[in-house]
Amino acid sequence: NDGDMHKYHGAFIIGLLTDKLHIEGPIWKERTSFSFSARAIPTLFFKNLIVDKDDTYSDKYNYYFYDVNAKVNHKFSDRSRIFLSFYKGKDHYHYDSYYHGDNYDNSIKNYSKDNSHLNWGNTIAYGRWNYVFNSKLFCNTTVSYNKYEMGLDGNMEDTYTVANKVQDRYYYSSKFNSGIRDWSARMDFDYTPMPQHHIKFGAEYIHHTFRPGIATSKIQDIDNGALQEDTVYNTSNSHAMRGQEISLYAEDNFNVNARFSLNAGVRTSLFHTQGKSYYSLQPRLSARYDLGQGYSAKASYTCMAQYVHLLSSTPL
């Protein structure tokens, strides 16, 4: 929804799982409009969703998410229009646990703590300019920014004290962060030289920044009152990996006659990262024949290339 250019209206909905808000209307009547929407789970406003506790222990859990979407649409003329958009979404989960025990006179105490936090989310911003050259040709020019982030941290601690002096203690904490950030610019043309031909062509540039992982951990161990270990480990990949991708494409949807149509196209791309370049040519061809009475026969050939892959390990 790009926003109503004539009047203001909106809605606020309280649901069992999510609450929603939507507002839209004109900024400059018949020229500029806006649209804003937001969604959240009600647990966003609670510190803890589930609490289980008694005199010696407590377990606390919570999960929430939210996302917001804002758009502005401006009409310069009947041939020129610009669209601006912003999106942000985030999910969060946390768990906290605590246990403690002591003897009858509190001279001996034992307690343990455990907590973990997991966050992930996306941020997207883009602007698109639509320009109509004539009745046969128009163009969309788009600039965008996309960022994904994930973070995980947690710690655990077990402590045993006698007469308020620590005899045994084990502490472990860890943090992990990763993310992907893309900047891109593209131009897409739509050309109809005659009724039988519908041609699309364009170009795109993407700058990738990958942060595969930044991990740190700390271990502290006390045994019989003596420090056995106090170490910080850093397995960070502090150097971001960058890649640049350039691509060109063209395709033609050709209606040969009332029953037979062809779609032929090609995409060529170049990916450069860490001093190396990778090139690919990706042709495609499809044909469709209308058999009548709602039936058709189709055949196609496509060659595609993917430069970035997700590698994951599966425990046996």
Predicted regions and their residues:
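Transmembrane beta-strand segments that form the barrel wall of outer-membrane beta-barrel proteins
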Residues: H6-L17, A38-I41, S261-H272, L281, ...
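Flexible, surface-exposed loop regions and adjacent strand-edge segments
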Residues: V51-T56, G89, Y98-S112, M156-Y170, ...
